[in-house]
């Protein structure tokens, strides 16, 4: 038996969990680093639920722990592992791994929202104050107060309790607390947070009375302005004292102790006032009272500072939640401008506590006026709106402020419109508006994404006190919030306007398509004539000679070409297999014919018909139909007939150079895409739906093949793809079983049929070449006249003597190798190759003849010289 070596023993120990745990305990730096790098959210949450949630931890302890963790993280070798040049993040994703409240919540009605109910947070009740006079008990009361301060952030409740504590020391009859505030002009004033706190008074009683005092006026205003305490023995002997409050309340003020409350920057944030010393020292406050009052007010300063930070964070959180809700609303509703404006107005009214919200939409056609005005009042929030009532209300709206803001592109904040001299209320500008209805006003422009154009104006009227409902001025916070709010309003309005514009464009398009489809469809008389003729007799394919690769249409009338097309559909079993109605097929054929332009020399109905005839011959005589599905056969014949629909007699290059609107629709194969779109329009026009017998999947498959086949007639795509096909043929690797190879073959077959005029008997080929040249020369003339450019030789009427040599070059570069490859796939398509070779010989002979004539002409000219 072999003995275990030292390495084996060490390996077994390392696999022992107890040994691993002991090692981790001995290497705490590594353990901490490993936990920081590897711990998951679930692990941290489990640790919290097991250890933290059941242990009450004071905030100071948590703060100290956080600071120690921060230090450890900074000292950890893994803490600073950022790549040089990487952007620094203000907040790490790991900071969000601790358990937080859900971002998205549902309200009582089940509606998803970003707004949470912050009023439901549980707080420990404040401990009742103790009024012992013993110094040890005073210390206990201070500790008790510190405990309350550390766990509560309600400034009103805490300051109320502080005053009750103070009462046990200085024994005043009444206490009041005033906080420093700023209006929209940044002018300071004082608002009572607690007023007339007395022994036995409740928090609700003390906080209900709200009084506003002017800065540097009265005793409280003076203390706030200068930051120095005042101890007044007889208030009525001090000229700064305002006796109006006594006259209103019936209370007699005698002695006053008034002290400032400062923050850590020594700025006055509030003023505390004690009135009427109740016992001792002749009813006046002593120096000891001042010291005790100042000591406790230091706690008030801490409370105010913490509470202001907390309230600011709550306000910012609430703001962000409202803005998130508004963003969600904007992206949720984009169909109706009226609906989205109603939701925006309701959100603004509810959050900002205003009486009225009016949103003006600027008229794009007439920038000096508004196209729409949406008005909502606080009573309408949550109720269905009546359009008639809203129109009547719109007549009572004053446009003066909105017009001013639109022109200046700057916000407007008016504390009291009746005192603003910029906008005098006269009969001319007042209209039907009742002046007393408007007190304070805030008006902000709504700009577009580029910030250089006003698309609307948001006007708020009468900000209300939450408790009393009294009208007050809008402050700077309101301005900032509305400024952020209108950014989302602008997005919503722009998105909705774009949606409405798209809807109007789509409606116009539908009407246009309806008109086009009516004019694109064949006339009923012509359809009935073809239907009657084809019902009587349609000659056989042999009689019509449409199975011959040498077929010529020159002797046929347009009606006879339509009969030939019906025969093609019939002999390919397409009518029977896809339940085509005879009337619909006749109308579709004549509609296709109608949508080829008669003023185009070559790319007209006759070219489309000849392409379809060559496709029919390849399928039947070339025996290619046996290797295709019925859907592929159907798609190829439709594509052959439709592949040049609405051809304008110019190529893609001309369309691009002339900056034709078609060039903006497609990035490549411009005309081919247009041909397919026209094909689709006819197939979907009423009375032309020959594919109505197909299932949905069959219909999609057929359209896909039709599109691929029509796009394949772009010679640029043919040149790009032919190398792959020729290589498969050369290596004898082509197979119809491979879907990609089959798709490639269908594309090559479409090109072969499109160019089949080059394979016709010489008299036919020569006549067609003249038609092609006429069309090309017309394009060259347009290039010279409209684009001021010299056309290529192929398009140049002055170079028509080069047609034979150019035809030889075209056959060698484009045609010959294609028909050779097609013959390898189906030997029955050999007539196409033979015809191409014979015509090459003819063109070559003409080219040589032209060259001799040119040489003879030069020789004769030389002899004359």
Swiss-Prot record:
Record key words, sorted: Allosteric enzyme, cGMP, cGMP-binding, Hydrolase, Magnesium, Metal-binding, Nucleotide-binding, Phosphoprotein, Repeat, Zinc
Protein name: cGMP-specific 3',5'-cyclic phosphodiesterase
Record pathway: Purine metabolism; 3',5'-cyclic GMP degradation; GMP from 3',5'-cyclic GMP: step 1/1
GO molecular function: 3',5'-cyclic-GMP phosphodiesterase activity; 3',5'-cyclic-nucleotide phosphodiesterase activity; cGMP binding; cyclic-nucleotide phosphodiesterase activity; metal ion binding
Species this protein is from: Mus musculus
Record bears the keyword Ubl conjugation: no
Domain GAF span(s) in chain numbering: 154-304, 336-493
Residue(s) carrying Phosphoserine: 92
PROSITE patterns referenced in this protein's UniProt entry, alphabetically: PDEASE_I_1, PDEASE_I_2
Catalyzed reactions per annotation: 3',5'-cyclic GMP + H2O = GMP + H(+)
Role noted for this protein: Plays a role in signal transduction by regulating the intracellular concentration of cyclic nucleotides. This phosphodiesterase catalyzes the specific hydrolysis of cGMP to 5'-GMP. Specifically regulates nitric-oxide-generated cGMP.
Annotated EC: 3.1.4.35
GO biological-process terms attached to the record: cGMP catabolic process; cGMP metabolic process; negative regulation of cardiac muscle contraction; negative regulation of T cell proliferation; oocyte development; positive regulation of cardiac muscle hypertrophy; positive regulation of G protein-coupled receptor signaling pathway; positive regulation of oocyte development
């Amino acid at each position: 038996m072999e003995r275990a070596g030292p390495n084996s023993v060490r390996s077994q120990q390392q696999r022992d969990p107890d040994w691993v745990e002991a090692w981790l305990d001995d290497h705490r730096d590594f353990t901490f680093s490993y936990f920081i790098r590897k711990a998951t959210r679930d692990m941290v949450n489990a640790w919290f639920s097991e250890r933290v949630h059941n242990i009450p931890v004071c905030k100071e302890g948590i703060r100290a722990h956080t600071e120690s963790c921060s230090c450890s993280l900074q000292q950890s070798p893994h803490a600073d592992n950022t790549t040089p040049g990487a952007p620094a993040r203000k907040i790490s994703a790991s900071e969000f791994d601790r358990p937080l409240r859900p971002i998205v919540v549902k309200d009582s009605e089940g509606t998803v929202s970003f707004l949470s109910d912050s009023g439901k947070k549980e707080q420990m009740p404040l401990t009742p104050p103790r009024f012992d006079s013993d110094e040890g008990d005073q210390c206990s009361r201070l500790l008790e107060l510190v405990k309350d301060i550390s766990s509560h952030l309600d400034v009103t409740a805490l300051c109320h309790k502080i005053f009750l504590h103070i009462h046990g020391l200085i024994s005043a009859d009444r206490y009041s607390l005033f906080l420093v505030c700023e209006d929209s002009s940044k002018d300071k004033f004082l608002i009572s947070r607690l007023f007339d706190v007395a022994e036995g008074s409740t928090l609700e009683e003390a906080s209900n009375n709200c009084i506003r005092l002017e800065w540097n006026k009265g005793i409280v205003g003076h203390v706030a302005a200068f930051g120095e305490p005042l101890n007044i023995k007889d208030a009525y002997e001090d000229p700064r004292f305002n006796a109006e409050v006594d006259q209103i309340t019936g209370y007699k003020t005698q002695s006053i102790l008034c002290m400032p409350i400062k923050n850590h920057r020594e700025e006055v944030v509030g003023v505390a006032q004690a009135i009427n010393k109740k016992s001792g020292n002749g009813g006046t406050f002593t120096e000891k009272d001042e010291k005790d009052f100042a000591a406790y007010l230091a706690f008030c300063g801490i409370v105010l500072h913490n509470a202001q930070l907390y309230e600011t964070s709550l306000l910012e959180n609430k703001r962000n939640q409202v803005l998130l809700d508004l963003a969600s609303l904007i992206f949720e509703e984009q169909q109706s401008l009226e609906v989205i404006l109603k939701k925006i107005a309701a959100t603004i009214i509810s959050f900002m506590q205003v009486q009225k919200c009016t949103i003006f939409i600027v008229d794009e056609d007439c920038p000096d006026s508004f196209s729409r005005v949406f008005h909502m009042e606080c009573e309408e929030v949550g109720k269905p709106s009546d359009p008639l009532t809203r129109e009547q209300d719109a007549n009572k709206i004053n446009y003066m402020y909105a017009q001013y803001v639109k022109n200046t592109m700057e916000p407007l904040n008016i504390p009291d419109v009746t005192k603003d001299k910029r906008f005098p209320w006269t009969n001319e500008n007042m209209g039907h508006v009742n002046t007393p209805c408007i007190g304070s006003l805030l008006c902000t422009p709504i700009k577009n994404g580029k910030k250089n154009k006003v698309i609307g104006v948001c006007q708020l009227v009468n900000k209300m006190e939450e408790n009393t409902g009294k009208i007050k001025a809008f402050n700077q916070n309101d301005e900032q919030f509305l400024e952020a709010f209108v950014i989302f309003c602008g997005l919503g309005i722009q998105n909705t306007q774009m949606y409405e514009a798209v809807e109007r464009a789509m409606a116009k398009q539908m009407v246009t398509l309806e008109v086009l489809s009516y004019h694109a469809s064949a006339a009923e008389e012509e359809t009935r004539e073809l239907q009657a003729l084809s019902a009587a007799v349609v000659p056989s394919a042999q009689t019509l000679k449409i199975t011959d690769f040498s077929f010529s249409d020159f002797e046929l009338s347009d009606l006879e070409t339509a009969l030939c097309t019906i025969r093609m559909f019939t002999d390919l079993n397409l009518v029977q297999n896809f339940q085509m109605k005879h009337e619909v097929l006749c109308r579709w054929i004549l509609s296709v014919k109608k949508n080829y332009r008669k003023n185009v020399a070559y790319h007209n109905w006759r070219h489309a018909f000849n392409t379809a005839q060559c496709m029919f011959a390849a399928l039947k005589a070339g025996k290619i139909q046996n290797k295709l599905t019925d859907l592929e056969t159907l798609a190829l014949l439709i594509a052959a007939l439709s592949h040049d629909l609405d051809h304008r007699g110019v190529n893609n290059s001309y369309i691009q150079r002339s900056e034709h609107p078609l060039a903006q629709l497609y990035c490549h194969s411009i005309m081919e895409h247009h041909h397919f779109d026209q094909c689709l329009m006819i197939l979907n026009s009423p009375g032309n739906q020959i594919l109505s017998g197909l299932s949905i999947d069959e219909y999609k498959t057929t359209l896909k093949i039709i599109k691929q086949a029509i796009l394949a007639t772009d010679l640029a795509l043919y040149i790009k793809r032919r190398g792959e096909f020729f290589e498969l043929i050369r290596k004898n690797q082509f197979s119809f079983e491979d879907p990609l190879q089959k798709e490639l073959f269908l594309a090559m077959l479409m090109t072969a049929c499109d160019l089949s005029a080059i394979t016709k008997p010489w008299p036919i080929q020569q006549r067609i070449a003249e038609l092609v040249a006429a069309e090309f020369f017309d394009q060259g003339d347009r290039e010279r006249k409209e684009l001021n450019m010299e056309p290529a030789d192929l398009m140049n009427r002055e170079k028509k003597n080069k047609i034979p040599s150019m035809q030889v070059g075209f056959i060698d570069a484009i045609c010959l190798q294609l028909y050779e490859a097609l013959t390898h796939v189906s030997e029955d398509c050999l007539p196409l190759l033979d015809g191409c070779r014979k015509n090459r010989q003819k063109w070559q002979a003409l080219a040589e003849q032209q060259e001799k004539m040119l040489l003879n002409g030069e020789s004769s000219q030389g002899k004359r010289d």
